[in-house]
């Protein structure tokens, strides 16, 4: 994720006399030299956007070095990864009996370790590009390093899903706060509309939870899965339209919400029920409407970005064909696959 953060630090100044001849210029240059292109406080700093606050240049009195120091608050554009993030393009750089190592081609520099216990060790070849999901609490940003490190695995379609029990209505103010995430989804959908339709179909079918025969077609315009996979008696709602109605107090968020496997993962759809009849493996999560919608919207964003990145990375038939072993691994983990 790209974001802007504010940091506080103390800079050591070797030549205070020269530094103070043009503090602003020297300070910005020093910050860029130390932090840009490196890890710092759980982020990878892309560029410094400004100095917010600084102290005077103090002279060290604990020795006779003549050096100085300055306390600084600065803002920076950063990139950072979270647990369970999806990365569409990780190039395998090492694969032996002990470990798989890959480097992300899309995010900040990060080395990803796929544990040797994973069955995909015998599938991915050095030089191939694989889609990866990061593990829980697995991203490490060691200060000063020029790349982060993480653990993960080749991303396989998920069979499980969560059910959320909402007992209080979403307020207009909360709905307004969610429009930033809605805008991101609309931007990603616009980007998706400009991509090759055959590629979108290929990857949507690849990551659909159920095994799909060649004569079954996904309707990507109305976000429905193949015939026979829809949930009976239930009609999904478009979360984006729902939130626009919530701004006008025209929708009720009470009840049970879920995005089960029959929906395309990058669709903006979800199911809402008065009584819970979802066939989930875990008990419903009781939470506020705002927390539930933030969770659903972020999931939609992650999958949409993931699908767009897959289309951009594997942008020709030859490249897709060279990775058939990876697609076969993914297909074998689907519900309904004949082993």
Curated annotation (Swiss-Prot):
Alphabetical keyword list: DNA-directed RNA polymerase, Early protein, Host cytoplasm, Transcription, Viral transcription, Virion
A Gene Ontology cellular-component term: virion component
Induction details: Expressed in the early phase of the viral replicative cycle.
Primary location recorded for the protein, binned into one broad class: host cell
Subcellular location: Host cytoplasm; Virion
Biological process, per Gene Ontology: viral transcription
Functional summary from the UniProt entry: Component of the DNA-directed RNA polymerase (RNAP) that catalyzes the transcription in the cytoplasm of viral DNA into RNA using the four ribonucleoside triphosphates as substrates.
Protein family: Belongs to the Asfivirus DNA-directed RNA polymerase RPB7 homolog family.
Subunit note: Part of the viral DNA-directed RNA polymerase that consists of 8 polII-like subunits (RPB1, RPB2, RPB3, RPB5, RPB6, RPB7, RPB9, RPB10), a capping enzyme and a termination factor.
Domain comment in the entry: Contains an extended C-terminus, with no homology to characterized proteins.
Protein name, as recorded: DNA-directed RNA polymerase RPB7 homolog
Biological source species: African swine fever virus (strain Badajoz 1971 Vero-adapted)
């Amino acid at each position: 994720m790209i974001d802007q953060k504010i940091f506080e630090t103390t800079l050591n100044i070797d030549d205070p006399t020269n530094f103070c001849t043009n503090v602003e210029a020297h300070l910005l240059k020093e910050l860029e030299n130390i932090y840009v292109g490196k890890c710092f406080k759980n982020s990878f700093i892309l560029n410094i956007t400004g100095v917010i606050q600084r102290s005077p240049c103090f002279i060290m009195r604990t020795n006779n070095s003549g050096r100085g120091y300055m306390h600084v608050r600065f803002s920076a554009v950063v990139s950072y990864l979270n647990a369970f993030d999806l990365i569409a393009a990780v190039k395998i750089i090492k694969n032996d009996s002990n470990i798989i190592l890959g480097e992300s081609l899309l995010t900040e520099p990060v080395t990803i370790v796929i544990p040797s216990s994973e069955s995909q060790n015998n599938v991915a070849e050095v030089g191939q590009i694989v889609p990866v999901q990061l593990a829980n609490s697995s991203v490490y940003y060691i200060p000063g390093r020029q790349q982060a490190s993480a653990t993960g695995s080749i991303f396989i379609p998920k069979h499980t899903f969560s059910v959320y029990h909402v007992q209080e209505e979403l307020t207009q103010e909360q709905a307004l706060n969610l429009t930033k995430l809605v805008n991101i989804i609309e931007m990603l959908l616009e980007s998706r509309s400009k991509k090759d339709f055959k590629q979108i179909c290929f990857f949507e079918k690849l990551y659909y939870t159920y095994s799909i025969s060649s004569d079954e077609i996904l309707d990507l315009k109305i976000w429905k899965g193949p015939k026979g996979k829809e949930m009976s008696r239930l009609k999904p709602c478009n979360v984006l339209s729902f939130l626009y109605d919530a701004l006008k107090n025209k929708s009720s968020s009470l009840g049970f919400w879920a995005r089960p496997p029959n929906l395309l993962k990058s669709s903006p759809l979800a199911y809402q029920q008065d009584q819970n009849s979802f066939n989930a493996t875990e008990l419903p999560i009781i939470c506020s409407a705002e927390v539930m919608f933030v969770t659903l919207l972020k999931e939609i964003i992650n999958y949409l970005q993931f699908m767009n990145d897959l289309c951009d990375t594997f942008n020709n038939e030859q490249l897709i064909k060279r990775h058939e072993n990876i697609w076969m691994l993914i297909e074998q983990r689907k519900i309904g696959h004949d082993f």
